[in-house]
Amino acid sequence: MQPPSSEERTVTVALAGQPNVGKSTVFNLLTGLSQHVGNWPGKTIERKVGVHHHRRDGESCAMRIVDLPGTYSLTANSPEEQIARDYVIRERPDAVAVIADAASLERNLYLLAEFLFLPVPVVLGLNMTDVAERQEIRISPRILEAALGVPVVPMTATKNQGVGELVAAVDRVIRGAIAYHPSRPAIREDHRAVLEEIRTLIAGQVPDPYPDEWVALKLLEGDAEITRLMRERMQERWEPVRAVLTRHEDALLAVASGRYEWIGRIVRAAVTRPRAGQITLTDRLD
């Protein structure tokens, strides 16, 4: 992997997404031969890092691209999920580019929702738009961007379309050239007071580099790693937290329901699908 020259300003960008969304294609287009393949520390999971060089206003710039394992969530139920969330929280890349399948936007927005709670700006690469178009799924990037509060870039990576625009959007977010005000999903209304109670109980106890609100949500979700971390950290002060979590064992459903309600509102606003029974272009071609 060719290192950036001393004259280049280098930023680090994590490339994230669910499996089979074209993330590897994007990574290869961005880095070409300037990549290194190894394993994540202590894991047998492949770790790919590359460098993308570009110019902005005559200035030479370099992006160090870290290809995170494909994951459906950041719940740490698998080594891939553990790696993805630990990297973003502990290493704090300058930005995360989340690659999504435009034809399965609802499913992909769940992972995006989790990244929005982490302390790193996010850009959404809406990939496989050609597949969505063949299925006559119409997505308004402008409405989607307004609803999410993050930059949205339509892409068809297999045709190298939109990849340069993704780099430009990530660059602008990192430089603060565009406003970044993400719209995060709220927990279901009947559990918002519970979330606030947990946040109050753990205030001042959350170790760096973990965000307080994210830790509170993970405790409500029953995340094993975060529960163990906070129990060991708080020791005798853990008991009130444990009591609240025990009384509200259904909180995981409240967190998930809040996210699905948020996803539903966004999709209804930004996505148009063929009417029930309507024959799509894909059907006609088949």
Region spans (language model):
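Conserved G1/Walker A P-loop phosphate-binding module
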Residues: 1-76, 90-91
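Gly-rich Lys/Arg/Thr-decorated short loops/hinges at beta-loop-alpha junctions or inter-strand turns
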Residues: 62-69, 92-93, 124, 241-246
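Active-site glycine-centered loops adjacent to acidic/histidine catalytic or metal-binding residues
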Residues: 67, 127, 156
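Switch/connector loops and helix/strand junctions flanking conserved nucleotide-binding motifs
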Residues: 73-75, 106-107, 131-136, 160-165, ...
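Extended helical scaffolds that flank P-loop GTPase cores
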Residues: 149, 176-286
